[in-house]
Amino acid sequence: MLDKIIRIATRQSPLALWQAHYVQHLLQANHPGLQVELVPMVTRGDIILDTPLAKVGGKGLFVKELELALLDGRADIAVHSMKDVPVAFPEGLGLVTICEPDDPRDAFVSPHFAHIDDLPAGSIVGNSSLRRQCQLRERRPDLIIRDLRGNVGTRLAKLDNGDYHAIILAVAGLNRLGLASRI
C-alpha cells in the first residue's frame, strides 16, 4: 500500500482544506510512508452564492463533484463536513468512516454585540442553515434573518462590511481556522 498514492477529494475552501489536511495527517501518522495528496475541487455550492441552498439543490450541491471524482477514479476518498453529507449515496459509494467530532455548538459573531439578546429589534442576522434560521426565529422573532452564503472568510467579511449586525457560524469551523477570537 505504501507505493500507492491516496488521493483525497475535497472542496477548495480554507475549512475544507483544513479538514482534508487533518485526514491526510491521520492517515500518514497511522501508516508511515503512505503518500497522500489532495485533489481540491470547486463545487456548484461554491459557485452559486446568491440563492438559498434549499432553492438550488440543498446539501448535494457541495458533494456532487466529489462523488464524480470518486466514481471516475480521480480520487480514492473524499473528505467532507458531515453536516453536508447526503443521506443517500450513489451506487458504489458509501460512508466509510467519521472522524471524532469537534465542538458542535453554534457561535454568535458580532462586532458590536456580545450576545444575541443584546441585538435591537429589527437587527439583521445572517446564516444559511435552515435549522439555525428556525432556532433564531423561535428565540427572536423580532430579528430579520437573511441568507448568508460563502466560506467562513467571506461571511466574516460581509459582517465586517456592515451587511449584517451579527452572523451565526459553527464554533468548530472558527476554531479550525484560528478564528476563535471572533466568537
From Swiss-Prot:
It catalyses: 4 porphobilinogen + H2O = hydroxymethylbilane + 4 NH4(+). One of its GO terms (cellular component) is cytoplasm. GO terms for biological process: protoporphyrinogen IX biosynthetic process. Pfam families: Porphobil_deam (PF01379). The keyword Transferase applies. GO terms for molecular function: hydroxymethylbilane synthase activity. Its EC number is 2.5.1.61. It is an enzyme of class 2 (transferase). Keywords: Porphyrin biosynthesis, Transferase. It comes from the Bacteria. InterPro entries: HemC (IPR000860), Porphobilin_deaminase_N (IPR022417). Binds 1 dipyrromethane group covalently. Its cofactor is dipyrromethane. Pathway: Porphyrin-containing compound metabolism; protoporphyrin-IX biosynthesis; coproporphyrinogen-III from 5-aminolevulinate: step 2/4. Tetrapolymerization of the monopyrrole PBG into the hydroxymethylbilane pre-uroporphyrinogen in several discrete steps. Monomer. The porphobilinogen subunits are added to the dipyrromethane group. Belongs to the HMBS family. This is Porphobilinogen deaminase. It comes from Yersinia intermedia.
